[in-house]
Amino acid sequence: MSTQDENDRREYYRIEDTIALDFTPLAGADALASDELHEASPLFNLLSELHVMDFESQHLLRNISERDRTLASYLKVVNKRIDLLGQAIAQSLLRDIGPPKHVTLSEGGISFFNAQPLPVDAHLALKMVLMPQALGLLLRARVLHCQEHEGQFEIGAEFEALTDAQRQLLARHILQRQAQERRQAREELT
């Protein structure tokens, strides 16, 4: 194992997950840009924006909650309704993206299997829907390694140019999955 791989493993907590995943190779100026990506699908962009807006408004909801509990309760109900709409959008998107894939996910990157090899240092646009929150993310990534494994290719990619909101949403998803894994492990012991 290289020093870079060891450093990657120490820097972020990794989880095993099953997500909807699609990717597109980026070339030319798109590959080198650090701008946030936008999907051609308006539904995917809407889903992604819903979660970013939810994340960015959490501190406002906490402030309102300190001053007016009734208003905060109402806003939480409205937020749940919006979440349900987001889940309906995600179900539609899941049909378009394809069957869920088993991945290893961290704040720093992703590892997944693919039928075709990808060149090391290739730049990708990764379209992911993380469940059960139906969190849609479109992220830039660079292929770190591609290794053949039982007729498939294990692709390891590092996320690039994440916004703070994207990084926080990924971290929250990973923490929730980690907590879920711990609960399941405790239940299996009892």
Regions found by a protein language model. Name each.
Residues 1-190:
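Structured alpha-helical
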